[in-house]
Every structure is written in C-alpha cells, then in structure tokens.
Amino acid sequence: MPYLLLFAMLFALNTPLAWAASCPDWTPQKAEAEAAQLQATLTGWDEHYHRQGIALVADELYDQSRQRLVHLQQCFGLAPSPSPLTSARGPLPHPVPHTGVDKLADRQAVARWMAGKTGVWVQPKFDGVAASLIYRQGQLVQLISRGDGLQGHDWSRHIPQLGAVTRQLPQAIDLHLQGELYLRLNEHVQAKAGSANARGTVAGLLARKQLTREQGNTIGLFVWGWPHGPERQADRLAQLAQLGFPDSQHYSIAVDTLEDAARWREHWYRSPLPFASDGVILRLGSRPPAERWQAKAPYWIAAWKYPYVQALAEVRDVRFRVGRTGRITPIAHVQPVTLDDRRITQVSLGSLARWQALDIRPGDQVAISLAGLTIPRLEHVVHRAVERQPLGAPAPGRHHALSCWQPSEGCEEQFIARLTWLSGKQGLALPRTGPGTWRRLVDAGLVTSMTDWLQLDAERLQQVPGISSLTAAQLLGSFDQARSRPFDQWLRGLGAPIGKHLQLTGGWQEMASRSAGQWQTVPDIGVKRSRQLVGFFAAAEVQAIATRLAESGIEGFSPPPERIEQ
C-alpha cells in the first residue's frame, strides 16, 4: 500500500487533494471523536496489510483517508498519529535504508520539483511491494520486506519459487539491490483496468508461509535501486541489464522537460504493460552516497501519481428526488471532489432500497468513481460519521404512477416532474418550459393543476420573480402552441402508459371506455400494460384533467357529437 512509503505528515503534505481542504465547523469534542474513529480504522487497515498481506481498502482510498486524518489533526490541534509503518517493522535490518518518495500533487508541483534540475529520469511507478535483495557470490540468498524502511521481515523462504526473478547472476559477485516485487499481468492498461488489486495480491502471496511454483511465477521484479552502484544512472542501468535486470533500463527514460515527463506518464498510463502502475517516478541521475540515505523521502526522487480512479468524498446531505412515475431516487450531495478533471458535487444512489441498505448520512465518507468515465457512481461507504443524523425520506407507498397531480404537501417534486414531462420532448415539446420554469410558476401559486397554465396571461406571468416581459411573451407563445398539439402528444405527455410507436385510434372517450380485454387486442399491449391503461383512464384526477382539456378545446378530449336521427 502507499503507506509503505511515507510517514503520515509527509504523506499528507504531498498527496493531491481529492476533497476540499477547508476545516470543518465542528466542536472540539466532535473533532476528537471523528479523528479517533478514523485513526482506529486506519490502524486496522495497517495491521491487516502489514501482518497478513490483506488490503481491506483500495490504495487510493487509504491515501485519501490518511490525508484526511492528518488534515483534521492540523485543523484542531490534535496530536499527530504514530507512523503508519509501525506494524510493518520487522527484525531484519536493511543493508541500506529504503528512502520512500514524496508525492507531487499536480503538474505545477512537478514543474517546481524539476525546476533547476538536470539529469532527470522517469520510470513507471510499479504497483507492488518494495524489498531488498542480497546476492552472495552471484546467488540470491536473502529477500527482506521494506518494513518501516529500516527493518523488515524475511521473505527468503520464497526465493526457490520465484521463477521470474533473477536468482543467479552471470557473475559471482556480492550485490545489494532494492526493487519492487509486482504481479505479472498480460496487456494491462492502467487507464482502463485500474490497479486490479495487483499490490494486494502480491502482498498476500508473500505473507504466506509457502508459495507453490505457479504462485511464485506470477511475481516479477523491477530493480529501481542499486545503493552502491555506479554514480551515473545510465551506467547503473547498463550494468543492471548485463546482470540480468533489463527491465530497469527498458523502463527508465531520460527527460529534459516537464512535457517529456508528462508524455511518458500518459503513455504508460494508457498503454498495455505487463504490470500495474500507479504513476511515474522522477529521479535524479546522481544521488548522495548510500551511507547518507535515510528512511524518509529525499530530495532526489519524487512520484507523480496517476489520476484517482476513486475519490473519497464527504456527504453533505441526502435529498430525495421523486420522478413523474413516483420513483424515489436518493441523491447524495457531497463536498466537491475531482475525478478525471470532472468536478463532482452530487451522485445518485439509484433507489430508496440501496440508500437504506447503505444507510448513508451527512458526514459519512464515501467512495466515488466514474461509470463509463462520465457518470459519477457511489461505490460504498468508507467511513461513517460518529453522529448519525436523522433523515426524512418520502414514504414509498405514497408515490406511484397515479399520485400527485397537484402540488400538495409532499407532492411538489412529483408534480413538477409531471409538468416537465408533459412539456418535454416526450410530450408536447414546448420550448422554454423546463423544470426551473415550472418550479417558479408553482412556487408563485400560478400553477396548481396540470392544465391551469393554459389560462395564464402576461400580467400574471410578469408578477413572478425572474420572469420579464420578454420571457412572459415567450412562455405565452409556448403555451399557445400546446393548444394545437395532436391528441397523442397530449396523451403521452400526461403519462398514459403507451409506447412511443403505438398507433392510437379513437379519442379520449373511446379509450376511457375500453376494458382490459379490449386493450389486449391492440398489438404490443399485454396483460400488464392493459391493466395499467384501464387504471390510468379510470383515475378520478386523470378524468378531471381530461374534462378541463375538453373545455379548453384540446383535440381528442371532447366527446364526439351526438348523431341526429333522420
């Protein structure tokens, strides 16, 4: 996980913010409770990962959660947490400490880091687990997990099964390397497939007592550090290739400009590769002697991570949208977050049942992704607020296909949805009559039914805030067009359960008199739809609407003229 790399403070200061960084308006007691709960969750994640090799949460959600904890501690003057690497520390000292890496927040931070530097190299940031490899007389004899950077655990028991790792050098020399053990993949495109839990899989395998040969063969090695190697990066890479580590040279590119680094970052992000990566590493070709390395991020190496696939967002409110048919859709309004350059402020929860199952309340921290790279999707709750705020959800039984034909209390949303559907492209196709217009008219008390807008005049429209004389004239023109719209557009706009391509015959009176059996003689109308049609035409509110439309002279709603006997 990313917390194998940095101490919490450095981590927080160098990770890009996915959520707004303003301090919450909390009491000290609430801040302490929220921070304590978040710390407990992070500690549990750390212990599972470091001791069992089990990742309970996606790496980037861990990153953002750790960042949020430090942010809260800074906001409220709380004591900083102990190093998240405490549980990773093992009994074996590394010959040379693992340094870790600073994370650069954005392109501007990368530009600042590169300013004035020469001899910069870029590499993919392999998404695996770091280790020290010790060769004696050309033979790999010891494998030590990164641990806390100073001491790690002994993974040497797995060496015989690591068939894809160079275990015998072409020369009988002593060698100490640092690198990334990663999951070998086939044609993996990071931008499409994400991390594929590659890091967690490798960590889980290495935490086992024993690997099978097949399991061991799924683990590869990328060497990124040769503490006592040649001074120049190009020389180190060339010699590593000769020693049996060609990937180090193949995936290391010298760059002169920010644009060069950005181009390679984009290339590796979208190209098929045999490994997962979560960004790129920028490193200087020259570095201090290994004797000066420390278990913290140095000046000569930095990471520029890929965009988040999931963002951690705080729920501000949950509101319930009632549609024309009575379907209730909970909408989570969140503290703005950014995914793939898209600013997200709200996300649909799909259904009332899903909201109830997730039990999302204001203050909860949720994971948000982009479905199809465009539509925000709430994946799950990551952290629950300590204080569970009550929410008043609409009663499911109150709203259905034949409810809310007037804006009575609790019916405003569905009523406005009905008007919007009526005037929209599915119905009358009236210009300038979106939900905002209908809401203003309803709030002003000018529209209290599905038809009284037909009687409005310019004087009353201009009394509504936000409606000018020009807007009033345009609305009246739209309303006037409604009078000449065909009967089938009115019928569909009012919500009659008929298909878009169904050929209608007869007027309102004839249709209202049909039985379910008679409706079933019409092509493409089955038992269920026929019952819905009978229920629609029999509804008292719908009959009242038809009567008012007949009085307004709308085609199809007036009864046929009586036949005169000769």
Swiss-Prot record:
Function recorded in the entry: Catalyzes the formation of phosphodiester linkages between 5'-phosphoryl and 3'-hydroxyl groups in double-stranded DNA using NAD as a coenzyme and as the energy source for the reaction.
Domain of life: Bacteria
Keywords: DNA damage, DNA repair, DNA replication, Ligase, NAD
Gene Ontology annotations of biological process type: DNA repair; DNA replication
An MF annotation (GO) of this entry: DNA ligase (NAD+) activity
Gene from which this protein is expressed: ligB
EC number(s) stated in the UniProt entry for this protein: 6.5.1.2
The species this protein was found in: Pseudomonas putida (strain GB-1)
Pfam families from the UniProt entry: DNA_ligase_aden, DNA_ligase_OB
InterPro entries the UniProt entry points to: DNA_ligase, DNA_ligase_B, DNAligase_adenylation, DNAligase_N, NA-bd_OB-fold, NAD_dep_DNA_ligaseB, NAD_DNA_ligase_OB, RuvA_2-like
UniProt cross-references to SMART domains, sorted A to Z: LIGANc (SM00532)
Catalytic reaction(s) noted: NAD(+) + (deoxyribonucleotide)n-3'-hydroxyl + 5'-phospho-(deoxyribonucleotide)m = (deoxyribonucleotide)n+m + AMP + beta-nicotinamide D-nucleotide
Similarity annotation: Belongs to the NAD-dependent DNA ligase family. LigB subfamily.
Protein name per Swiss-Prot or TrEMBL: DNA ligase B
Keyword Phosphoprotein listed: no
Catalytic center residues: K125
Keyword Hydrolase: no
